[in-house]
Structures are given as C-alpha cells and as structure tokens.
Amino acid sequence: MSEEHQESYHSDNLIDLMNHTLTNDHLQLLKKLGEMAAKLRMNLFLVGGTVRDMLRGVPGGDLDLVIEGDALAFSQNVANVLGGKVKHHEPFATATWVGAENLKLDIVSARAESYAKPGALPTIRHSHITDDLARRDFSINAMAIHLHPASYGQLVDPFHGRHDLTNGLIRILHSQSFIDDPTRLLRGVRFVSRFNYRFEQKTANLALATQPALTNALANVSPERIVHELKLLCHETDPVSSFSKLEDLHVWQALLGLTFSSSSATHLSRLQEEQNGEPLHWFQAIATVGFLEDNWKASLVPFAITAMEQRFLQNIEDIQKRLTNMTRFSTDYLHKQLYQVPEEPLRFYALSSGEEMQKVLDLYLHQRKQLQPLLTGHDLMELGMKPSPLFKECLLLHECEQLKGTIENKQDALQFAREFFNHKQPL
C-alpha cells in the first residue's frame, strides 16, 4: 500500500464482518484475487453497494472490484489462472469474469472522471482508489475494502460513508455532483426510500439551489439513462413517497415541466394497489405526473421509447377525447366509443377519475370482460351475407345490444343480423 493513500484507510478491519456476510465461495475468491493482484504489484479493492450493505448487516450480493492498474489485463490473468470466461468492455476499462457455479465479478480500473458539460457522460483517466471513490454518487457508496494480503479487510472511507450510514444520511461528495450527473437525484431519492434515510442538509440545500442549472443538465442526459433510474425507483416498496420527494426537490418540473400533485399521488397509490405486490410499470407511474395537464403528452413523448409506451399515450389521448364529447355513459354506448381501446389504458384512466366516472368505467370493463359474443363473421356468411365493412359494424352493434340486454341468445343475435343487413344500418 503506497504511503500517499494511507490517510484514507479507516482503522477498523472488516474481516469478521466479511466472514459473517459473504459466502465461503466469495471469501475464497476475494482472497485469491487479492493475492494475484499483489503478485502483479497492484492493489485490489471490493467497492460499492456490497461494502455499504455489509456495513448495514445485509448479506453481500454482486462483487464489484476496482484495481489500481489495468483491469482488462488483470481479468485475463484471472481467467488464465482460475478458468472461466471473461468479457472485456474496452472503452470503459472494465471487464466481467464468470467462473464456476456462476461466480461473477465486475473488475474496473481505478479512475478519475471529468465532465465536459453538465449531464454529459464523463471523460475518464486511470488513477488511484481515492479518485475512483471520489467520482461516486454518495458517501455511503464511496467506500472500499482492501484485498491486498498485507491490508486485507481494511476499510477505505475517505468521505466518511460509514458515519453517514450510522446516521441515516445521503450525502453528495462535492457541490457540483447533481449538476455533473442529475440522475444522482433520482438515485438519492431511491436510497432515501429504500433505507428510510434522509438527505444531509447541505445536500438537500444544493438540490434545491441548483434548479436552473439542473434543468439545463437534464437536457444533456439521454432518456435511456433517466428511464433506467425510473425503473429502479418503481421497483422500490414506496414509489409514491419517492415521487413526492422528487416533487419537493422540483425534479418533475425540471424533467417534464409537470407537477406531481396530490391527485397524482392518489392516482399512483391506486395504481400500486392494483399491482397486488408486483412492481409498478415505470411508464404508467410517470404518466401520473401532471396527468392530462396541457403539455402532458408532449412532455412524456421523449420517454416513450418502445412502441407499447407510444401506443399507451395515444390510447389515453383517444379515451380523453371520446369521453370529453360523450353525453351519456351507458355500457353499450361506452362500448361503441371504446371497444378498440385495450384494458390497461382504460384501467389507468379510470383510476385517475372521480368516483362516479371510475364506477362507470369499472362497470364497463367488468361487463366487457364477461362479454361472450354470440355472432361471428362465419355466422354472417352462413346467413348469405358477403364480407364487407358492414360485417364489423354488425358485430360491434350486436355486442352493444348484448351489453344492453336486448340480445340474450344465439337466435336473438341471428335475428339482429338479418334485420341489420336488411336495413344496412350504419353506426
């Protein structure tokens, strides 16, 4: 261990904690890798969420390693000695090694980062562990454990992450952190929710004080990066609280130009209840933000990356237009207007509605789900009708009559079809 970094190492040794929280396979692997790195005159460290969770008493998960040296060369050396497969990610100086029984670890060269402009992806250069930890989002994620045989188990904690863990604080590492990478705000709120922590006061103040710059920085972040963070946020146990916290920090205004109001919170709560313990779909979750405000659809379009999400937005717009122009809401009339709209956007819309409209749409969806059409196109051809656009009208209208209760059996349905084609009634 070089003298220039000794001041960063916590006096506590975490060997006992490692033995308690890591599997035997992981422990043996880490010791072996530390020895291999030492023989190559390199320092190897366990970093990130595994260290954080160990200190919280939570069993370790994935192994993320940082080496003061060439991660690509070291990972290849690991594969040569221990077997397994290695995949290099050369632009980022990272590698993934998979060994026997699916033992997996990610190895990264220690590096420093600089940002050409707020929100942009960073430029990296090789460096030491302290610089590598300094590029991370929060102090609780900026700790490492030394794996060198002479220092094995020593905690590297230059930003006092262990203190913040003990006190339940989420703290950024420098004043430009949120501007350099605005997605850190989303991650911070996720950790606040997951661990029941709070933002350290200066961190909270900086989040609020940097709003104009934050809006500009977010414009440089790709929708895919933001979507990734939103998906993770929606897998937490209390997304409503997280979305409300993002509103308090003005993130929704900066990101979408929309407001997560009390009605948005009610809408999201109803959506979550409908999931029966399953994670929320991230796109439906953010669609509750400023739902049906004037610029709602335009604000969400950049994040509607898949065809399914694009159709969802279009379906909601169609529902809104049709319901706005309707003067009666009987089930059969609703069916004429909404029969082509899938159940999911209808449920979403219903959950945003007032009590009366929600009851109307719930009843329609229930009856539509129970509907078993008594007529088919084959039936119409057997009646001597030639296929035409009127087939679709006839089949739809007979479903409406079924919902109304005027068609109760097959004979009623066939009689309806005969009369329809005799009169060629349009919709």
UniProtKB/Swiss-Prot annotation:
pH dependence: Optimum pH is 8.
Annotated catalysed reactions: a tRNA with a 3' CC end + ATP = a tRNA with a 3' CCA end + diphosphate
UniProt EC number: 2.7.7.-
Enzyme class at the top of the EC tree: transferase
CDD domains with a match to the protein in the record: NT_ClassII-CCAase
Listed Gene3D superfamilies: Beta Polymerase, domain 2, cca-adding enzyme, domain 2
Binding site for ATP: 49-52, 136-137, 141, 181-190, 194, 225
GO MF annotation list: ATP binding; ATP:3'-cytidine-cytidine-tRNA adenylyltransferase activity; metal ion binding; tRNA binding
Binding-site residues for Mg(2+), renumbered to this chain: 62, 64
A Pfam family that the UniProt record links to this protein: PolyA_pol
Transmembrane segment boundaries: none
Cofactors that this protein relies on: Mg(2+)
Domain of life per record: Bacteria
Gene Ontology BP terms: tRNA processing
Record's keyword terms, sorted: ATP-binding, Magnesium, Metal-binding, Nucleotide-binding, Nucleotidyltransferase, RNA-binding, Transferase, tRNA processing, tRNA-binding
Family per similarity comment: Belongs to the tRNA nucleotidyltransferase/poly(A) polymerase family.
Role description: tRNA nucleotidyltransferase involved in the synthesis of the tRNA CCA terminus. Adds the terminal adenosine residue to tRNA.
Protein name: A-adding tRNA nucleotidyltransferase
